[in-house]
Design a protein with these regions (language model features):
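Short His/Asp/Glu-rich catalytic/ion-coordination signatures at enzyme active sites or charged loops
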Residues: 1-7
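Short, intrinsically disordered, charge-balanced linker/junction segments flanking boundaries
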Residues: 241-245
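Catalytic cores of eukaryotic secretory-pathway lumenal/extracellular enzymes that build
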Residues: 2, 12-219, 224-226, 232-237
Length: 245
């Protein structure tokens, strides 16, 4: 095996994480963390969708749906749900409060898995709008990152009940002018895009074309699932090479 990260997660680090699961990881503590919030499951277009629905104690709070990406889950939001729903408890003001909805994307977490193709960004955006209306929110905002950013942008473009969006991964194509006369900053961005396409996107090709073939190995082996995901945490997070940070 290669001892560095040039070909993926090193064996030594894989063993370290597997040992942590066996000897230190406490699922019940994680369960307590998640159970601080209100969890529900509903059926949208034939797929069971799990979501957190945390209403603010402030009645005039603004409804907000937050969407995660890959490799991620609603766990990403456990540190912000309470400050968003009850800002006065964290030094904020009542006018900044939100009623927060955090759905798990189809096939993620406790959500069901679609049995047929078609659950792309547009269908998920439509389903999220349906979910918010079912919860009584005829006017709401949307936030997301990674695939959640794509879903959020689609909600903002095509869905009438959403009045505002925020993404932490804005998506846009370079203009022809910027391609012909790029600034140094744009050159750096284009080089990063080229690197991603050539060296960092193999997972996406496999998952988007033959997910079932890959799925057998990931479902059968917890360590395989961990290795597939932790390599992306190492590569994409601002963690100084230590995903546990």
């Amino acid at each position: 095996c290669v001892d560095d990260w040039t070909q993926g997660i090193p064996l030594s680090y894989t063993k370290e994480l597997a040992d942590y699961w066996l000897t230190e990881y406490d699922w019940r503590e994680r369960e307590k963390l998640l159970n601080r919030f209100d969890h529900y499951i509903t059926n949208l277009s034939g797929v069971d969708i799990h979501f957190i629905h945390q209403r603010s104690p402030h009645p005039e709070a603004f409804p907000l749906i937050i969407t995660h990406g890959w490799p991620g889950s609603i766990v990403e939001f456990h540190k912000v749900i309470e400050p968003l729903t009850n800002p006065t408890a964290f030094g904020g003001e009542e006018k900044d409060a939100f009623h927060v909805v955090c759905p798990s994307l189809p096939g993620y977490g406790f959500s069901g898995k679609p049995a047929e193709s078609g659950w792309g960004v547009e269908k998920i955006a439509t389903a999220w709008d349906e979910l918010m209306v079912c919860l009584g929110y005829e006017r709401f905002g949307a936030q997301g990152g990674d695939w959640g950013a794509a879903v959020t942008q689609r909600i903002g473009q095509n869905i009438g009940h959403c009045v505002a969006i925020h993404t932490n991964m804005p998506i846009g194509q370079p203009t022809q002018e910027s391609l012909e006369n790029p600034t140094d900053e744009e050159k750096s961005a284009l080089e990063g895009l080229t690197y991603y396409q050539e060296w960092d996107s193999g997972y996406s090709k496999q998952q988007s074309t033959r997910p079932q073939t890959l799925g057998y190995g990931l479902v059968d082996s917890p360590v395989g699932q961990m290795a597939w995901i932790i390599e992306k945490f190492w590569s994409w997070m601002d963690c100084d090479g230590h995903p546990e940070n």
